[in-house]
């Protein structure tokens, strides 16, 4: 990658995503489940750039959306409505109404209250809402507590007993059609045994429902496949992942749904920034760059590790903190990281930032959001232009008092 040329053409900081890498990951995951009917629903929240969504739609991907805005993004990018599912804990009445009007595949319900709200909306529209229920199997995903979602103490899904009652209610409703079951126990899982454990619990529920003449069509295993951010980490084997799921579904005629996000896009992305200067005090060396936590918040929010390289710098290394210009002590990309000495304008590359990078960015400190680039078949193109100050104030300026 010619970072100097990219910096000259687009300036820094910027994100760049390798679309060919994403395609390869997508096809490998699809291949792992070829023994059974399956559908990938890409988790839009991981990276919602329209060009990236369009590329996946062209591969016949489905999309897992957690807001009506994400549903609209997927449709705008060319997704088929019947390959979109709508998940998330806090769906509003208006979001549910629009989802039904778009005639998406199904809505993942997270509570009894949400089911009753959806039923009332469907009744108003004189439609039958296709539903799946997110079951919380109370399985420990053994991941960061902020991204663990499968325990009773987490806000997601409903317990097995409540789910059973919800399915029975939906079966007898004139405006609800139960078509699937869903679970997602957490994100960034390098040990996939908890997913297999959860699949066994939920498959048992499906068999119980079948005995009650509730025949579901979709068995949605969520996402959660982890990626190797650090060199000592190993990614899950896709064959083992798939076989562990398939083993739980013997005798059940179900389409497997899966919701990869991070797994598809994280390692495709790099956040490229420039060194502004170094700062040294009695105890610590700081490398100050033109990117900041508003661009990439994962290190600040989760203490997440990202490999950092200086592609054109060599020489003796020493420990340093890599920090941005935000007025927060939590504004850092790395702490106590061993890097060579730097000078103003040196290029720094922060690796594995294709997921939850730009999609979690903000305008904190009135900083402009960065541009995004795609690398595809050896060619680099702009897929989101850099924001400017006028973009930031466009929705406020007209309200200034004369």
Swiss-Prot record:
Cofactor requirement: pyridoxal 5'-phosphate
InterPro entries in the cross-refs: Ala_racemase/Decarboxylase_C (IPR009006), DAP_deCOOHase_LysA (IPR002986), De-COase2_C (IPR022643), De-COase2_CS (IPR022657), De-COase2_N (IPR022644), Orn/DAP/Arg_de-COase (IPR000183), PLP-binding_barrel (IPR029066)
Positions that bind substrate: 262, 298, 302, 328, 356
Top EC class for this record: lyase
Any GO BP: lysine biosynthetic process via diaminopimelate
A family per Pfam: Orn_Arg_deC_N
Binding, pyridoxal 5'-phosphate: 224, 259-262, 356
Catalysed reaction equations from the record: meso-2,6-diaminopimelate + H(+) = L-lysine + CO2
Residues the record lists as N6-(pyridoxal phosphate)lysine modifications: 45
Pathway entry: Amino-acid biosynthesis; L-lysine biosynthesis via DAP pathway; L-lysine from DL-2,6-diaminopimelate: step 1/1
Biological function: Specifically catalyzes the decarboxylation of meso-diaminopimelate (meso-DAP) to L-lysine.
Assembly mode: Homodimer.
Entries under HAMAP family matching the protein: LysA
Protein family per UniProt: Belongs to the Orn/Lys/Arg decarboxylase class-II family. LysA subfamily.
Name of the protein in its database record: Diaminopimelate decarboxylase
């Amino acid at each position: 990658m010619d970072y100097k040329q990219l910096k000259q053409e687009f300036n820094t900081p910027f994100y760049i995503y390798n679309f060919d890498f994403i395609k390869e990951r997508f096809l490998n995951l699809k291949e792992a489940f070829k023994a059974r009917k399956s559908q990938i629903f890409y988790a839009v929240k991981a990276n919602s750039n329209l060009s990236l969504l369009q590329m996946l739609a062209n591969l016949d991907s489905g999309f897992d959306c957690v807001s009506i805005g994400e549903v609209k993004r997927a449709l705008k990018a060319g997704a088929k409505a019947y390959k979109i599912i709508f998940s998330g804990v806090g769906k509003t009445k208006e979001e549910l109404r629009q989802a039904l009007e778009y005639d998406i595949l199904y809505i993942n319900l997270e509570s009894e209250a949400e089911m009753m709200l959806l039923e009332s909306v469907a009744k108003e529209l004189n439609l039958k809402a296709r539903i799946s229920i997110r079951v919380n199997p109370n399985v420990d995903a053994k991941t960061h507590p902020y991204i663990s979602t499968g325990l009773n103490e987490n806000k997601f899904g409903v317990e097995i007993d409540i789910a059973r009652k919800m399915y029975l209610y939906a079966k007898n409703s004139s405006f609800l059609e139960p078509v699937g079951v869903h679970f997602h126990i957490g994100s960034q899982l390098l040990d996939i045994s908890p997913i297999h454990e959860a699949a066994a619990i939920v498959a048992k529920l499906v068999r119980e429902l079948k005995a009650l003449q509730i025949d579901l069509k979709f068995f949605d295993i969520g996402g959660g496949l982890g990626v190797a951010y650090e060199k000592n980490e190993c990614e899950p084997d896709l064959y083992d992942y798939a076989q562990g799921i398939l083993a739980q579904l013997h005798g059940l005629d179900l389409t497997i749904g899966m919701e990869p996000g991070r797994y598809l896009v994280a390692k495709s992305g790099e956040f490229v920034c420039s060194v502004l200067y170094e700062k040294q005090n009695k105890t610590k060396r700081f490398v100050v760059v033109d990117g900041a936590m508003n661009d990439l918040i994962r290190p600040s929010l989760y203490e997440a590790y990202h490999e950092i390289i200086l592609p054109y710098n060599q020489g003796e290394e020493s420990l340093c903190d890599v920090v941005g210009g935000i007025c927060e002590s939590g504004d850092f990309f790395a702490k106590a990281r061993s890097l060579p000495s730097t000078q103003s304008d040196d290029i720094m590359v922060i690796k594995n930032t294709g997921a939850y990078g730009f999609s979690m960015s903000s305008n904190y400190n009135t900083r402009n959001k960065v541009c995004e680039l795609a690398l595809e078949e050896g060619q680099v193109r702009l897929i989101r232009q850099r924001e400017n100050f006028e973009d930031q104030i466009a929705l406020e300026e007209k309200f200034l008092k004369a």
